[in-house]
Amino acid sequence: MSIDESTAARVAKLARIKVEPAALPALAGEFNTILGFIEQLNEVDIDGVEPMTSVTPQVLKRRADVVADGDQQARVLSNAPDAREGFFAVPKVVE
């Protein structure tokens, strides 16, 4: 795959990056270099290699999935400038 100047301009527009017309050939060249590096990955033999989710073996500790209220209502509401009946109180906005 090769990137020409019009494609480079389109990518720049989609990325909301202002690129001067004089800089488009260099940008297209950089895109082509990047794509060349990516195409090298197709040459790697990955037959027999297991998919990985991480480069280090990790096992996540599991805990029981228990529904709880968190028992934090008083602490959370202590930060509120105004709380009533266990809820945040805010000024009325709509009449």
Curated annotation (Swiss-Prot):
<protein>
    <recommendedName>
        <fullName>Aspartyl/glutamyl-tRNA(Asn/Gln) amidotransferase subunit C</fullName>
        <ecNumber>6.3.5.-</ecNumber>
    </recommendedName>
</protein>
<dbReference type="GO" id="GO:0050567">
    <property type="term" value="F:glutaminyl-tRNA synthase (glutamine-hydrolyzing) activity"/>
</dbReference>
<dbReference type="InterPro" id="IPR036113">
    <property type="entry name" value="Asp/Glu-ADT_sf_sub_c"/>
</dbReference>
<keyword id="KW-0547">Nucleotide-binding</keyword>
<dbReference type="GO" id="GO:0005524">
    <property type="term" value="F:ATP binding"/>
</dbReference>
<dbReference type="Pfam" id="PF02686">
    <property type="entry name" value="GatC"/>
</dbReference>
<comment type="subunit">
    <text>Heterotrimer of A, B and C subunits.</text>
</comment>
<dbReference type="GO" id="GO:0050566">
    <property type="term" value="F:asparaginyl-tRNA synthase (glutamine-hydrolyzing) activity"/>
</dbReference>
<dbReference type="GO" id="GO:0070681">
    <property type="term" value="P:glutaminyl-tRNAGln biosynthesis via transamidation"/>
</dbReference>
<comment type="function">
    <text>Allows the formation of correctly charged Asn-tRNA(Asn) or Gln-tRNA(Gln) through the transamidation of misacylated Asp-tRNA(Asn) or Glu-tRNA(Gln) in organisms which lack either or both of asparaginyl-tRNA or glutaminyl-tRNA synthetases. The reaction takes place in the presence of glutamine and ATP through an activated phospho-Asp-tRNA(Asn) or phospho-Glu-tRNA(Gln).</text>
</comment>
<dbReference type="InterPro" id="IPR003837">
    <property type="entry name" value="GatC"/>
</dbReference>
<keyword id="KW-0648">Protein biosynthesis</keyword>
<keyword id="KW-0436">Ligase</keyword>
<keyword id="KW-0067">ATP-binding</keyword>
<comment type="similarity">
    <text>Belongs to the GatC family.</text>
</comment>
<dbReference type="GO" id="GO:0006450">
    <property type="term" value="P:regulation of translational fidelity"/>
</dbReference>
<dbReference type="GO" id="GO:0006412">
    <property type="term" value="P:translation"/>
</dbReference>
